[in-house]
Amino acid sequence: MSLKTPKGTTDLNPDDALVYEDLIDRTKNIFKLHGAVPIDTPVFELKSILLNKYGEDTKLIYDLKNNGGEECALRYDLTVPFSRYMSMNKLKKIKRYQIGKVYRRDQPSVVQGRWREFLQADFDIAGESLPMMADSELVCCMNRLLKTYNIGDFVIRVSDKRILYGIFEVCEIPNNLFATVSSSIDKLDKIAVNDINKELKLKGLTDKQIINLNIYIQKSGTVDVLDFLRENDVYKKCSEAVDDLCKLYEYCKIMKCSDHLIIDLSLARGLDYYTGMIIEGKYLNKNIGSVAGGGRYDNLIGSLENSSYTNTYNVPCAGFSIGLSRIFSCIQKPKVNTNVKVFISASGKLLLEERLKIQSILWEANISLETFYNKRNNPGEHKKYCVKHGIKYLIVVKEEQYNKGFVTVIEVNTNLENVIMIDNLPSHLQ
């Protein structure tokens, strides 16, 4: 039998797990800064709730074996479970965050940061609000997150699904091709436009439709794109959406989060439940695709199957997901790979009881520490261990010193030794 993890999954060693912990903490802090509260939902959901929500990606849902009970599937994202939670609890307003693993039966690619099991962090604003205020806060929150990870320069691309519908109408592309053509357009930042055009041709578009479509989907910028739309025939089809993006851009300027913002008409996120603004965050010069994405989904809660409140209960929502597994793959791993501050050793004898008493004193003072419970002590080896794992202090317990109420404390990086009274250890080490 071959011992390995399933394809598209990975273990985390202690070093990587500590980096993940720090990444999660930094993400939570930004969400809390924006006033979000945490929720949690099951890793698997009723299959009927997940179906028909993800467009062409529905095929990537992991079904669970039916053992004579409910038909279930692993969650594909955190948005649909959140909407189910809202509907079940008849909530009208919440600003929430959730961090958890999601599952997709995709073709994995470590280089491109694509896994079958990966960690996502979601931020959502549910409830009535002034037009584009919640959407603008999404941009602000995403902007702050991508800055705090300190990976490099990035862009936040926005558009609106209603503008896409307007473009398709002007280009005379039938509605039944919306999903498949949108999925091709969304690849424009990864694939050359000529290859996209060939793909569109294979999907049934005429040369005229492709030429007209290219006039729009190659437009990206800021106010210049909005001006272009206002002066174009498409404005009659989606004037509200264009005006909403104008508000979004102005609000983001006021909140000082427009420095990385781009209005990009090729943005066409494929999930069926988006109804308005769509958003995507991407680091430049990183071959991992987008690291964050989302948008407005005003009808998802009301559309859930088997909901007692369908057609009578609905809540407007906007939110985004950030792929922490992709972020992790870009982070420069720090040399310090432990959160332990102190190692307790002994010289000459085992001195187990003495070490345990010191251990108890330091734990009471909330000082993280480590000691070995084996049959031999070697302070020299323990110091090497401290250097390797980034532990700041080495305490060496010596019988004669201990009986007088003292121990030796070594600062590992400087080799500076101090004899410290045991009662003063917490204040010395903090």
UniProtKB/Swiss-Prot annotation:
An example Gene Ontology CC term for this record: cytosol
- What InterPro entries is this protein classified in? aa-tRNA-synth_II/BPL/LPL (IPR045864), Anticodon-bd (IPR004154), Anticodon-bd_dom_sf (IPR036621), HisRS-like_core (IPR041715), HisRS/HisZ (IPR004516)
EC number(s) on file: 6.1.1.21
Q: Which SUPFAM superfamilies match?
A: Class II aaRS ABD-related (SSF52954), Class II aaRS and biotin synthetases (SSF55681)
Q: Which Pfam families match?
A: HGTP_anticodon, tRNA-synt_His
User: Is Nucleotidyltransferase among the key words of this record?
Assistant: no
Protein's GO biological process: histidyl-tRNA aminoacylation; mitochondrial translation
Q: Does the keyword Nucleotide-binding apply?
A: yes
> Where can this protein be found?
Cytoplasm
Q: Which family does it belong to?
A: Belongs to the class-II aminoacyl-tRNA synthetase family.
Q: What is this protein called?
A: Probable histidine--tRNA ligase, cytoplasmic
